[in-house]
């Protein structure tokens, strides 16, 4: 079962316009109850944040992820502005997981991008 905070290799093709595409890492951000249901049923959708190795500029709605702690091959950033739901069939293999601090930063980036401040 995939868990919140895990990084998975996913297949985002076909994509349109400026959507993240190709096979790439993504951080699972859907809650573990939804993830467990999708696993149990063998179908359904989970929510992920795509990751890119282009870290020349990291915006406030993006989170830098260290290769040394995540299982990624190089330092990357999670792109909260690219959040999306994907079919579980798009999950290819687990890579690693973000730290608790990185997941908290990603939660803040998602709040900023989605304007969920309370």
Curated annotation (Swiss-Prot):
Signal peptide positions on this chain: none
The UniProt record lists the keyword Iron-sulfur: no
Expression induction or repression: Mildy induced (5 to 9-fold) by oxidative and nitrosative stress, starvation, growth in the presence of isoniazid or gentamycin, strongly induced (24-fold) when grown in a non-replicating state.
Matching SUPFAM superfamilies: Cell growth inhibitor/plasmid maintenance toxic component (SSF50118)
One Pfam family recorded for the sequence: PemK_toxin
Keyword Hydrolase belongs to the record: yes
Record-listed E.C. numbers: 3.1.-.-
MF terms (GO), sorted A to Z: DNA binding; RNA endonuclease activity
Class in the EC hierarchy, top level: hydrolase
Disruption phenotype: Individual deletion of mazF3, mazF6 and mazF9 have little to no phenotype, but a triple mutant shows increased sensitivity to oxidative and antibiotic stress and starvation, decreased formation of persisters cells, and a decreased bacterial load and pathogenic damage in infected guinea pigs.
Gene Ontology biological process: mRNA catabolic process; negative regulation of growth; rRNA catabolic process; symbiont-mediated perturbation of host process
InterPro entries, sorted: PemK-like (IPR003477), Plasmid_toxin/cell-grow_inhib (IPR011067)
Keywords, in A-Z order: Endonuclease, Hydrolase, Nuclease, Toxin-antitoxin system
Record-stated family: Belongs to the PemK/MazF family.
Subunit and interaction comment: Forms a complex with cognate antitoxin MazE9.
Function recorded in the entry: Toxic component of a type II toxin-antitoxin (TA) system. Upon expression in E.coli and M.smegmatis inhibits cell growth and colony formation. Its toxic effect is neutralized by coexpression with cognate antitoxin MazE9. Acts as an mRNA interferase, specifically cleaving between U and C in UAC sequences. May cleave its cognate antitoxin's gene. In E.coli expression with non-cognate antitoxins VapB27 and VapB40 partially neutralizes the toxin.
Protein name: Endoribonuclease MazF9
Species assigned in the record: Mycobacterium tuberculosis (strain ATCC 25618 / H37Rv)
High-level lineage: Bacteria, Bacillati, Actinomycetota, Actinomycetes, Mycobacteriales
């Amino acid at each position: 079962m995939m868990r919140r905070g895990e990084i998975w290799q996913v297949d985002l093709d076909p994509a349109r316009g400026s959507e993240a595409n190709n096979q790439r890492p993504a951080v699972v951000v859907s809650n573990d109850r939804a993830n467990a249901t999708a696993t149990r049923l063998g179908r359904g959708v989970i929510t992920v944040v795509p990751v890119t190795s282009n870290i020349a500029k990291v915006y406030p709605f993006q989170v830098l992820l260290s290769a040394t702690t995540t299982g990624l091959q190089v330092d990357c950033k999670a792109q909260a502005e690219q959040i999306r739901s994907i079919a579980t069939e798009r999950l290819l293999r687990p890579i690693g997981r973000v730290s608790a601090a990185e997941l908290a930063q990603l939660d803040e980036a998602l709040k900023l991008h989605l304007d969920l401040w309370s």
